[in-house]
């Protein structure tokens, strides 16, 4: 199955609606390939999940599976390490954490059932700036408290637990000062991962000291039914600003309120704002990535859509990809000066870029790529 000419024209024509950014359009050398850390399964819900590396050949117009390791259950977050290995976590409530080596072999696996804590993983990991520890988002399954696990980088053994100062911490990143930025999703969940008592939602964005876990700052939104989930940094050179984008999911009881809900929050300096009140018609952003040099791309898999936000047009979301199951996102530099994004869809990998032609590469076999992927390198 191939995408239509109309859909490609939408991807290319989206630039007309974006603010001018001074891009050069011709005569630039384009990368020939890209490697992505990804997770996937076969076409059926019961198929085995794998994590590994997908290689995109732009000139050959194909994707190959460079390495793959079978996983015990569905994964969620993927974190590349400097030596080429890959940290993979089980989907919430995650019972395992795994390291996969460059050759695709499983080097380590931690089963949380064997730890003394009652915590389970919430899906994301980040490596400390010093490289000695990793931080994991977790939930105490007895109390429901949000936790940050501090684990030895080499052994993956838990060294300490910090409070996340909220419910259901999901993704976390490190800021320029080495502190942790954590999206507390705020949704009460049972041990079987069922949502309940949504009137008690307590979503927040917090900053913790990266050495001690001390709470430095906590931000909340006026609407308590907006769950803060995924994070990305993006630098806007023209405005000399770095933004933290937060992809959100609406949990309102009223379907019309969910459909009308915004899907993006932005930490601008020290203020958490909702710049674009328009959303996606579903109130569900699945992933976020830096794009267009200072902006963010957001995916909405429920409606088959990826949209672009930029600080030069802060009230607007521009559609850049409209394909079924538009989901995993990662920033892609591409030709100078960068600003592109790679999007997983039901049909294959979609490439969007301000100065490169859009492209769609079909999957190498029948497969369903999971929620997130990460660009490793391009050549």
Regions found by a protein language model. Name each.
Residues 73-79, 119-124, 167-173, 226-232, ...:
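Repeated scaffold domains used in trafficking and secretory/extracellular systems
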Residues 40-43, 137-140, 182-201, 246-259:
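Short, conserved, GDST-rich strand-edge loop motifs in beta-rich repeat architectures
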Residues 112-124, 136-175:
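Asp-box/WD-like beta-propeller blade repeats and closely related beta-sheet repeat scaffolds
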Residues 68-81, 85-127:
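Blade-loop segments of beta-propeller domains
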């Amino acid at each position: 199955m191939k995408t239509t000419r109309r859909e490609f024209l939408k991807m290319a024509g989206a630039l007309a609606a974006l603010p001018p950014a001074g891009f050069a359009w011709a005569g630039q050398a384009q990368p020939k390939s890209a490697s992505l850390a990804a997770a996937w399964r076969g076409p059926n819900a019961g198929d085995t999940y794998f994590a590994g590396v997908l290689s995109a050949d732009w000139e050959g117009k194909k994707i190959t599976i460079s390495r793959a390791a079978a996983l015990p259950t569905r994964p969620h977050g993927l974190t590349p390490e400097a030596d080429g290995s890959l940290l993979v976590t089980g989907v919430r409530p995650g019972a395992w954490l795994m390291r996969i080596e460059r050759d695709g072999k499983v080097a380590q696996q931690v089963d949380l059932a064997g730890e003394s804590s009652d915590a389970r993983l919430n899906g994301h990991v980040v490596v400390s700036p010093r490289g000695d520890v990793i931080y994991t988002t977790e939930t105490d399954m007895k109390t429901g408290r949000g936790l940050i696990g501090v684990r030895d980088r080499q052994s993956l053994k838990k060294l300490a637990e910090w409070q996340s100062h909220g419910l259901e911490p999901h993704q976390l990143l490190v800021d320029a000062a080495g502190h942790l930025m954590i999206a507390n999703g705020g949704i009460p969940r049972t041990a079987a991962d069922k949502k309940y008592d949504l009137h008690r939602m307590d979503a927040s964005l917090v900053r913790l000291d990266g050495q001690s876990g001390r709470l430095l700052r906590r931000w909340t939104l006026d609407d308590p039914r907006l769950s803060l989930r995924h994070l990305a940094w993006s630098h806007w050179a023209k405005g000399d600003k770095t933004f933290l984008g937060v992809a959100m999911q609406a949990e309102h009881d009223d379907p019309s309120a969910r459909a009308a809900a915004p899907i993006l929050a932005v930490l601008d300096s020290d203020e958490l704002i909702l710049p674009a009140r328009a959303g996606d018609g579903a109130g569900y952003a699945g992933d976020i990535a830096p794009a267009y040099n200072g902006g963010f791309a957001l995916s909405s898999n429920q409606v088959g859509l990826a949209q672009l936000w930029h600080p030069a047009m802060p009230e607007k979301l521009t559609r850049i990809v409209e394909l079924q199951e538009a989901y995993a996102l990662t920033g892609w530099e591409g030709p100078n000066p960068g600003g592109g994004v790679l999007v997983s869809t039901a049909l294959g990998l979609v490439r969007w870029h301000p100065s490169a032609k859009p492209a769609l590469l079909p999957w190498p076999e029948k497969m369903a790529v999971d929620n997130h992927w990460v660009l490793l390198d391009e050549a």
